[in-house]
Amino acid sequence: MSSSSGKVGFVSLGCPKNTVDSERILTQLRTEGYEISASYEDADVVLVNTCGFIDSAVQESLDAIGEALRENGKVIVTGCLGAKEDVIREVHPKVLAVSGPHAYTEVMNQVHQVAPKPEYNPFVNLVPDTGVKLTPKHYAYLKISEGCNHRCTFCIIPSFRGDLVSRPIGDVLGEAQRLVKNGVKELLVISQDTSAYGVDTKYRTGFWEGRPVKTRMKELCDELGRMGVWVRLHYVYPYPHVDDVIPLMADGKILPYLDIPFQHASPSVLKNMRRPAHAEKVLHRIGKWREQCPDITLRSTFIVGFPGETEEDFQTLLNFLEEAQLDRVGCFKYSPVEGATANELPDPVEEVVKQERWERFMEVQQRISASRLQAKIGKRMDVIVDEVVEEGAVCRSKADAPEIDGQVFLDNQTHLKPGDLVTVEIEDADEYDLWGRPV
């Protein structure tokens, strides 16, 4: 390998927040003239952006580092697992350097030591003003803040990413505008805690296009809603002021979609998680949201088998599912994470019980999901095309986020292109997906 070639291999793991970090590093690499290598053997060095949220993610990251070391030998590690350098070096002592998440300057300095900066080339350095994106051209993640002020007992992300730091609202809206001008049809708003946006700045007033705008979720949504694209909210903590964005959904300014992790419904379990413990209030709010915005899609995630969870607690959760009738739900079996305070809680749940509860949970939610999707047969809706395959077009409705939700299949519609917006009539459904035809 030539040390003057300026080629960098890149492996990106983890959540959409990590994807955005990877995009920023890749953008800086391309801006400085580095080539991004598609293979290990052609790269001067390999960057691995890791995840460290749960044990399986840690193992995946360690495996990826090991593969890069075997195939190339020169590896720089960054990302959430990088905050635990001792864990990485215990398994892979030969990595060149380790840094934590969003350590962009440190990562670039490490790259410079291994692969010298290429000579400036105005053609190589023509990077789009949106930067390098790892998503398809028609949608993009818009990260509005870093870190989190909550200390949920099952989560160690604040130890990686620190407390909440909100981006200036003018910077966020400027990035959104550039993305839209370059053809993005859907903005996926992400952070560790989207509804806390601006709390750390005391909702400081920023400026956008000469107008004062508060650094706050409602005002952000209001401005994004003027850009003429789909706007989807992710990772929304159930603060009371979440209610303020529902009218924007009802008015069509942003998508009627709320990704709001409730985690459980039992007051005792929620207390042990250090989460809001008012299931009855949550059900009341869900009812109000649906009154204001009948088309709203509610996505949530839950944990079963948390330490101390009794059969009665679990039944409370199942009852909540039946009453809430959520559209999209993810469920995880509790897994101890090194450094999480939940590890100190008494009465751990046996693995066989966790599995049994997870299966019961999924059986209930699968039935709910199937029922809610069956109700869409015969209705018309707008979908966005994600890809076109031999059988037809694979799309998503306003109720479906990329990768985590369902899809809408349009058989034989091979003339469509990714990013096309199409009005369809739904003809069939199963537990998670829909089938339709253009109208």
From Swiss-Prot:
<keyword id="KW-0963">Cytoplasm</keyword>
<dbReference type="Pfam" id="PF04055">
    <property type="entry name" value="Radical_SAM"/>
</dbReference>
<dbReference type="GO" id="GO:0051539">
    <property type="term" value="F:4 iron, 4 sulfur cluster binding"/>
</dbReference>
<dbReference type="InterPro" id="IPR038135">
    <property type="entry name" value="Methylthiotransferase_N_sf"/>
</dbReference>
<dbReference type="InterPro" id="IPR005840">
    <property type="entry name" value="Ribosomal_uS12_MeSTrfase_RimO"/>
</dbReference>
<keyword id="KW-0808">Transferase</keyword>
<dbReference type="GO" id="GO:0046872">
    <property type="term" value="F:metal ion binding"/>
</dbReference>
<dbReference type="Pfam" id="PF18693">
    <property type="entry name" value="TRAM_2"/>
</dbReference>
<dbReference type="GO" id="GO:0035599">
    <property type="term" value="F:aspartic acid methylthiotransferase activity"/>
</dbReference>
<feature type="binding site">
    <location>
        <position position="15"/>
    </location>
    <ligand>
        <name>[4Fe-4S] cluster 1</name>
    </ligand>
</feature>
<feature type="binding site">
    <location>
        <position position="51"/>
    </location>
    <ligand>
        <name>[4Fe-4S] cluster 1</name>
    </ligand>
</feature>
<feature type="binding site">
    <location>
        <position position="155"/>
    </location>
    <ligand>
        <name>[4Fe-4S] cluster 2</name>
    </ligand>
</feature>
<dbReference type="Pfam" id="PF00919">
    <property type="entry name" value="UPF0004"/>
</dbReference>
<protein>
    <recommendedName>
        <fullName>Ribosomal protein uS12 methylthiotransferase RimO</fullName>
        <ecNumber>2.8.4.4</ecNumber>
    </recommendedName>
</protein>
<feature type="binding site">
    <location>
        <position position="148"/>
    </location>
    <ligand>
        <name>[4Fe-4S] cluster 2</name>
    </ligand>
</feature>
<feature type="domain" description="TRAM">
    <location>
        <begin position="374"/>
        <end position="439"/>
    </location>
</feature>
<keyword id="KW-0004">4Fe-4S</keyword>
<dbReference type="InterPro" id="IPR006638">
    <property type="entry name" value="Elp3/MiaA/NifB-like_rSAM"/>
</dbReference>
<feature type="domain" description="MTTase N-terminal">
    <location>
        <begin position="6"/>
        <end position="116"/>
    </location>
</feature>
<keyword id="KW-0411">Iron-sulfur</keyword>
<feature type="binding site">
    <location>
        <position position="152"/>
    </location>
    <ligand>
        <name>[4Fe-4S] cluster 2</name>
    </ligand>
</feature>
<feature type="binding site">
    <location>
        <position position="80"/>
    </location>
    <ligand>
        <name>[4Fe-4S] cluster 1</name>
    </ligand>
</feature>
<dbReference type="InterPro" id="IPR012340">
    <property type="entry name" value="NA-bd_OB-fold"/>
</dbReference>
<keyword id="KW-0479">Metal-binding</keyword>
<comment type="function">
    <text>Catalyzes the methylthiolation of an aspartic acid residue of ribosomal protein uS12.</text>
</comment>
<keyword id="KW-0949">S-adenosyl-L-methionine</keyword>
<dbReference type="InterPro" id="IPR020612">
    <property type="entry name" value="Methylthiotransferase_CS"/>
</dbReference>
<dbReference type="InterPro" id="IPR013848">
    <property type="entry name" value="Methylthiotransferase_N"/>
</dbReference>
<dbReference type="InterPro" id="IPR002792">
    <property type="entry name" value="TRAM_dom"/>
</dbReference>
<dbReference type="GO" id="GO:0006400">
    <property type="term" value="P:tRNA modification"/>
</dbReference>
<dbReference type="InterPro" id="IPR005839">
    <property type="entry name" value="Methylthiotransferase"/>
</dbReference>
<dbReference type="GO" id="GO:0103039">
    <property type="term" value="F:protein methylthiotransferase activity"/>
</dbReference>
<dbReference type="GO" id="GO:0005829">
    <property type="term" value="C:cytosol"/>
</dbReference>
<dbReference type="InterPro" id="IPR007197">
    <property type="entry name" value="rSAM"/>
</dbReference>
<feature type="domain" description="Radical SAM core">
    <location>
        <begin position="134"/>
        <end position="371"/>
    </location>
</feature>
<dbReference type="InterPro" id="IPR023404">
    <property type="entry name" value="rSAM_horseshoe"/>
</dbReference>
<keyword id="KW-0408">Iron</keyword>
<comment type="similarity">
    <text>Belongs to the methylthiotransferase family. RimO subfamily.</text>
</comment>
